């Protein structure tokens, strides 16, 4: 029985360390990426996974070592994993609608009017096109008011 307790404690410790490592990678990604969309992707995907691993590790630790099952911990695990992606989706959507900068790796998509170009002339044209599309969307959206 004692060896099983030690194995589960080791599994809980590994999950805590793995969750901490993924959170560190998420923090590096938030600092390293260039625009709000890439940063939100790094923040949401990896932080959700890191919180999941960390809370499962804590849950296993408490069940094995103290015999205590926390419903609050389980509810927080479910709540964070449901609300974090939805919240970041809304932030990215608001940034897109307000015309936030979109990073471009290369000029492979020059036909796309939404993407920003590296030179100033195409960049201002792309910004004007995006502003026109936003205005059309607003008119269509608020037409019924």
Swiss-Prot record:
Q: Where are the transmembrane segments?
A: 11-31, 51-71, 72-92
Membrane-topology annotation of the record: Multi-pass membrane protein
Q: Which UniProt keywords apply?
A: Antiport, Cell membrane, Ion transport, Membrane, Transmembrane, Transmembrane helix, Transport
Cross-referenced Pfam families: PhaG_MnhG_YufB (PF03334)
Tell me yes or no: is Membrane among this UniProt entry's keywords: yes
**Subcellular location, record wording:** Cell membrane
**Could you name the domain of life of the organism this protein comes from?**
Bacteria
* GO molecular function, a single term: sodium:proton antiporter activity
User: Is Lipoprotein set as a keyword in this record?
Assistant: no
- Kindly report the protein's main subcellular placement as a broad class: membrane
User: Looking at the UniProt record for this protein, which Gene Ontology cellular component terms does it annotate, in alphabetical order?
Assistant: plasma membrane
The family annotation for this protein states: Belongs to the CPA3 antiporters (TC 2.A.63) subunit G family.
Query: Subunit details for this protein?
Result: May form a heterooligomeric complex that consists of seven subunits: mnhA2, mnhB2, mnhC2, mnhD2, mnhE2, mnhF2 and mnhG2.
In UniProt terms, what function does this protein have?
Answer: Expression of the mnh2 operon in E.coli is not able to catalyze Na(+)Li(+)/H(+) antiport. It does however confer higher growth rates than the control strain at up to pH 9.5. The operon may encode an NADH-ubiquinone oxidoreductase.
> Would you tell me the protein name for this molecule?
Putative antiporter subunit mnhG2
């Amino acid at each position: 029985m004692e060896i099983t307790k030690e194995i589960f404690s080791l599994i809980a410790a590994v999950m805590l360390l793995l969750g901490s490592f993924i959170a560190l990678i998420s923090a590096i990604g938030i600092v390293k990426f260039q625009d709000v969309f890439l940063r939100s992707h790094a923040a949401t995907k990896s932080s959700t996974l890191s919180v999941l691993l960390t809370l499962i590790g804590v849950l296993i630790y408490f069940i094995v070592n103290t015999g205590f099952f926390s419903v609050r911990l389980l509810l927080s695990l479910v709540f964070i994993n449901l609300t974090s992606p939805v919240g970041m989706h809304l932030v990215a959507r608001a940034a897109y609608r307000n015309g936030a900068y979109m990073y471009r790796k290369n000029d492979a998509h020059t036909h796309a009017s939404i993407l920003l170009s590296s030179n100033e002339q195409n960049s201002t044209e792309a910004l004007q096109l995006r502003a026109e599309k936003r205005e059309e969307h607003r008119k269509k959206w608020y037409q019924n008011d």
